[in-house]
UniProtKB/Swiss-Prot annotation:
It comes from Chlorobium chlorochromatii (strain CaD3). Consists of two distinct domains, a catalytic core and a N-terminal extension that is involved in tRNA binding. The lineage of its organism: Bacteria, Pseudomonadati, Chlorobiota, Chlorobiia, Chlorobiales. Disulfide bonds: none annotated. This is Serine--tRNA ligase. It comes from the Bacteria.
Length: 426
């Protein structure tokens, strides 16, 4: 959530941000917010004046009663009228503040100056050079669906029977390989990258979704359990960030770095017509997440660290990939800057998103009220929060199976995973 003071002082800058994000249609809401803010300031001033008058009259009534000279009735009547006016103003003030809160929650984050201006994903910039690894694939390739079915390690049909489309089943060595990927990534992040492992809840309350920005904007993307008023997490970013919701974080504890494995659940509303085969679009998938809380001045250095940590996983697995710097029209509403890391699918002959690494600056911290004091004499400030997929296993599994397939239809297990699987080939 943006600071209303920043919006008030920089309305043209916020309007330009909306246009850069291809959200020019939201500008009337910005004007509505500014008008609510103007009315609120006027109302607060009038209410304060009336409260001062009420206090003055109240003292005069007390003085008359104390001296026993004259009648306070006229002043009491005046005080009642003032009190009624204050009640009405306070009621309207509550309405204005609620309206402002809703408008602020819906407003996207500002953009970092380095974010390229563009309309859609076609305008994203390739960051650096694509990274290649040599794999001997000089034979007719099978895609991940064909490999999974032939080797009986993936079963999408039975997953659909149990839960519906988009719920994969890993079987035998496929399940072992998935678990190996998760354990390898967690070990790398905790042992080499300095993260603390967390195993969080997979169900969260609405306040948690609100804190990280998934609510209310993406309410149609999450699974809701009505009887208990809980939501299945779309990403571990939600519970990890909300661990410190409403807290004053110890300054010497910053930066805080968490990593977690969770299953993730997404309805993917509006995905009709998109490629939904196999792992390309699923409702449940596994992901290892990285989340950081930093001082404001350190957050962009931390973003580069998170990106490097995600890339390190792919380099250890020898999976070809590229990094994209997302443009203003494709970046998420919550992020000020975001990198996507895409893995290459040799069978599909295209890149597939496997990780997003984002800086939210104080956007989530303001919504979640996560603060710190730079020093004992300073006022509290909001921390900056960041997150990165480190990584989602579904698209990663596509690339891994296709790159490590052999001419006779088997799968070689990457060297770094063999100590986790206990076998070298599927």
């Amino acid at each position: 959530m943006l600071d209303i003071a920043y919006i008030r002082q920089n309305p043209d800058e916020v309007a330009a941000m909306l246009r850069h994000r291809q959200l020019a249609s939201e500008e009337p809401k910005l004007q509505q917010l500014l008008e609510c803010d103007r009315q609120r300031k006027e109302l607060v001033q009038r209410s304060d004046e009336q409260k001062a008058l009420r206090n003055k009259v109240s003292k005069e009534v007390a003085e008359i009663k104390k001296k026993g000279v004259g009648s306070p009735d006229e002043l009491i009547s005046q005080m009642k009228a003032v009190s009624d006016a204050i009640t009405a103003m306070d009621s309207r003030l509550s309405e204005l503040e609620a309206e402002m809160e809703n408008l602020l929650l819906a407003l996207p984050n500002k953009l970092h100056p380095s974010v390229p201006i563009g309309r859609s994903a076609e305008d994203n910039m390739v960051f650096g050079e694509p990274v290649h690894f040599e794999h001997s694939l000089n034979f007719p390739l099978k895609n991940h669906l064909e490999l999974g079915k032939a080797l009986r390690i993936l079963d999408f049909e039975r997953g659909a029977k149990v839960s519906g489309a988009g719920f994969p089943v890993y079987v035998g060595k496929g399940a072992r390989l998935e678990r190996a990927l998760i354990n390898f990534m967690l070990d790398m992040h905790t042992e080499q990258h300095g993260y603390t492992e967390v195993f969080p809840p997979f169900l969260v309350n609405q306040e948690s979704l609100r804190g990280t920005g998934q609510w209310p904007k993406f309410a149609d993307q999450v699974y809701y359990i009505g009887e208990d008023d809980l939501y299945a997490i779309p990403t571990a970013e939600v519970p990890l960030t909300n661990l410190h919701r409403g807290e004053m974080v110890e300054t010497n504890a910053l930066p805080i770095s968490y990593t977690a494995y969770t299953a993730c659940f997404r309805r993917e509303a509006g995905s009709y017509g998109k490629d939904t085969r196999g792992f390309l679009r699923v409702h449940q998938f596994n992901k290892v997440e990285m989340v950081k809380f930093t001082r404001p001045e350190d957050s962009y250095t931390a973003l580069e660290e998170i990106r490097h940590h995600a890339q390190a996983i792919l380099e250890a697995l020898k999976i070809p990939y590229r990094v994209l710097l997302l443009c203003s029209g494709d970046i998420s509403a919550n992020a000020t800057k975001c990198y996507d890391i895409e893995v290459w699918s040799p069978a599909e002959e295209k890149y597939l998103e496997a990780s997003s690494c984002s800086n939210f600056e104080e956007y989530q911290a303001r919504r979640s009220n996560i603060r710190f004091k730079p020093d004992s004499k300073s006022k509290p400030e909001f921390v900056h929060t960041l997150n990165g997929s480190g990584l989602a296993t579904s698209r990663l599994m596509v690339s891994l199976l296709e790159h490590y397939q052999t001419a006779d239809g088997h799968i070689r297990v990457p060297n770094v995973l063999q100590r986790y699987t206990g076998f070298t080939e599927i």
